Amino acid sequence: MSRIHMIRHGRPASTWGDADPDPGLDAVGSEQARAVAQALLALPPSERPTRVVSSPLRRCRETAQPLADALGVAVQIDPRVGEIPTPAALSAEARPGWLRLAFQGTWNEIQGDLDYVAWTREVAQGVASYPGAAVFSHFVALNAAVSAATGGEVVAAFRPDHVSVTVFDLVDGDLILVEKGREASTQVL
């Protein structure tokens, strides 16, 4: 058995619909990144991450960097733990509405270019391929991994807060949910 910590990125400098499609962290988010690194480093040695993996997006990479620096490792980038793919025909302005609708339903009800149930499995496989890692990701991808681990169908099964840490054990190649991370008190969209 191996433990995997999946962390939502820190607070970004901008949100959906703003001018920057790939924002980094704001000052609060940068402090959150340092704090979550310290919290992970304070875990017992048998639970402490030894590898750092991130979504390709800047807010995740910047959240991951303090832990990688402290561990003396490079951040491994894996698009499988990235944001939920938006339908190709959807404009950036329409994405928040599409996500709000998706959050109200199940994975198989999401309208788009791909099979989103299969996408949840791809996210889970991505996470599971990094035993002993801290995986920095996104709200929807965290929900995808939790759904895959629990067999859940609801898209927004929980509302992970910025830098909340969701814990999985890896048993025979499968993710087993140990603990969901702290939930947000504010809306994502």
Q: How should these model regions be labeled?
A:
Residues M1, D69, V73-I77, E83-G97, ...:
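Acidic, low-complexity terminal tails and accessory targeting/binding regions
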Residues G29-A33, Y116-T120, V135:
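Conserved anionic group-binding/transfer micro-motifs
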